[in-house]
Amino acid sequence: PSQAASSFSLLQAVSIIRITDPDLRKKVMELSANQPYIEEAAEFWIFCADFNRNHQIAPNVDLEYIEYLLIGTFDAGLMAQNALTAAESMGLGGVYIGGIRLHITELTEVLHLPKHVIPLVGLCIGHPAGEKPGLKPRLPQSMVMFDNQYQPLDEETLATYDQQMREYYQNRPVKAPFTVKRVKGWKDHIEDHLERSKLPFMLEYLNKQGFAKK
């Protein structure tokens, strides 16, 4: 089902690395902030933007334009969401692991990824250990969907949503191993996550893999 996801002009610029080797699982976990789900889950897949296959078919096409990175990233996201939706339809659970990018150069070497392939996100799949937690509250639709033109941030609506998230976090504290501050509400979460998501090596890595040079 995941492979049936929509693909930009059928370029199908995605590959999945299924990690079955226990030693490799442990290594990937260590490179991903030691998130235990990677070792514990029944299945662990890594979704990659992959233009290596297309490059072999059309070797004379210049893939250094950033548009190709956008295409591969978008396609990989669709496929990853389809995979989780299919798993949940069978009574399974899952969690995405964005932390695989924290040491992306070493991960690329461990997975033997060639040029024009980059690992974007991991997905752990398995039977939930306990009762499935409720979905995190989402931003109200008025803040994410606009008619005809972009709308400025509504501070009052944001404050209401932030309070909803404060109540949510009281019952389910943030437990990310690399959280840099105590998260009480959504605004705290944004400040925390943006701060720890700085990966200054990423552009150099992307260039090395043949992406985003133009």
Task: Name each model feature, range by range.
Residues 3-214:
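Acidic, surface-exposed loops and disordered segments
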